């Protein structure tokens, strides 16, 4: 009911001109938008969006609506333009995006080191394999014997996969800092083989969704005006790691050329990004870093810059991007950061 009321409010504000007014009131605020995967609808396994997914149609709509108010550039110091970013570094993030958006749209891809030159879907980021397991495992009861699992008996039905992800798999993953989730994944594989999970997906889906960019592709993307940034080595929640593990994820394996570029935290919310992680990012030489929150709250600095995740609904998209929703929730305008790359 609440969601319906918000959608109705967004619709009224759009057609009444209030949204346009808030675009003007927030003209000094730089908009950075986060995307993850853009996958053709016909490739989705069982029609499911596993993880953060846009279809080609939903992504195209968002780009068209953005362009009504902003040019799209990679200039983070230009508040008059909007910057689009893509987290993780899977093949679809350039291949499908560039096809849909056209050559005039350039973005920033934040890549996890584990995915560079990785063409093996069974060795994708652990968190993505866990999501595919819980979404595609057949209905039934599975017994998981692993130290960090919060509930050993998994009863999977058609309608409870999101609940199981949020309340069982995700907290069990976060607690598994010793193996960064690989031990948990092996335990699930023992209960129902991962190869059987991925067999439900088409080869083209697996290539686009679960294989990474090659070094040659990264060079080509850069030549075409895109930017490649760092997104840690293995995409594990940083706040759950030791200081040594954090430095490995953030600094040790980061290519030198990426350290002059903005950094993106995996997950990018308060529980996954602690102060120590932000300090390591700064000391490693990155000029700034992005969160996945519109309001960074008390973390008001250029090492936790805000990003928008846009709705698939046109009216909610403008309600959010204009800053009107933010104003109604917080009684203030969007935060302004002057020249974060300086």
Question: Which residues are covered by each model-predicted region?
Answer:
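Short amphipathic alpha-helices and their capping/turn segments at secondary-structure boundaries
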Residues: 18-26, 98-101, 212-223
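Extended, charge-rich helix/loop segments that form flexible
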Residues: 34, 121-224
